[in-house]
Amino acid sequence: MHKYAAIDIGSNAVRLLLAVIAEPAQNPIKITWARMPIRLGEDAFLLGRISDEKANQLKNTINGFKYLIEAFQPLDFMACATAAMRTADNGQEICHKIFQETGISIDIIDGRQEASFLFKNKPKDLFSEKEACLLIDVGGGSTEMTLFYQGRRIASESFNIGAIRLFKKQADPLIWEAVEHWVKDNTAGYNSIVAIGSGGNINKLFRLAKGKKGKPVSCKTLTSIYKLLRQLSIDQRIKQFRLRPDRADVIVPASEIYLKIMQWSGCRNIHVPMLGLSDGMIRVLHERRSGIFFY
C-alpha cells in the first residue's frame, strides 16, 4: 500500500489530497480531500502581487495541511502552485517564507508542466483508441489543454485565460483568438473527438446537470445551464443552486470557456471524471517511486 499526499495551490482555492495506490498500476484511491477558499488570483491578476493578508492565509493553510500530512505518513508528497503564483511578482518570495516557517517546499510550475500533470489523469475507459481525446482544464487563471490520440500525446498548451481572469475582466482580448486557432488547428482532421473536463467548475456543472458516472454531458445541456446561471445574480445562484460564494461568481465565465472550446473542436459531449491537478500529482509521485508509468 503506497501513500501519497499532494497540495494544489490554485488561483481560487488551495487543495490537499491524501491518497493510496494498492497495486503498481492501480488508480489512486482518495482517502481525504480538503479545500480552503483562498482567492490568490484576485490579488495576482489585479495587483500583480499577493497581499500580505492572502500570503498569511496561505501560510496558515499550508501549516494546517502539514499536520494532516504528518499524521497520514505518506511515502512522498508534493506541493505545486499554478497561475496566480506564476503571475505574482512576489510568488517566489512567498514560497520561500512558507518553506522557512513550515518546511513545506512549493514548486511554482509553468503551464506546460501543469498540463503534463493533468495528462496523467487520462481515463482510458471513457474513449476508444480510434477517437482523439481533448483534455480541458479551466482554472482560475489559466486553461490547459492536451490532445491525445492512440495513447500518445499529440499537442499540449496553456493559455492565460481562466474563470477569475474573465470575471475580473483581466484576460487579454486577443487570447480568445489564440485559443480558437490552437483548438481548430490541432483538432482538424479527426473524425471523432472526445472532450474530458477537469476543474472545480466543470465538476459543479456536471452535478447541476445531474450527470451520471461514466456518462458524458451534452454541449446542449451545458449551454442550457449556462444560460440559466447567466440570468441570475450571484446571490440568486447561491440560494437557488446552493453554490459556494467563491463558485457562484466564476462558474459562468468558466462555462463560457468550456463551451467555446467544445464548439471550436466539434465536441458534442464532455466527460467529467471528477479529477484535477492533485490527482495527476499523486500519479506523478507514484511513477517516480515505482518506475511504473500511467501514461
Language model features by range: what are they?
Residues 2-29:
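N-terminal basic/disordered segments at the start of proteins
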Residues 4, 18, 43-74, 82-96, ...:
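Helical "lid/coupling" subdomains associated with nucleotide-phosphate turnover
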Residues 79:
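Dinucleotide-binding Rossmann-like beta1-alpha1 core, especially the glycine-rich loop
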Residues 25-44, 70:
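Conserved ATP-binding subdomain of kinase catalytic cores across diverse folds
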Residues 8-13, 136-142, 198-201:
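A short acidic Gly-Thr/Ser loop motif
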Residues 7, 36-38, 136, 159:
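Preference for bulky hydrophobic residues occupying beta-strand positions
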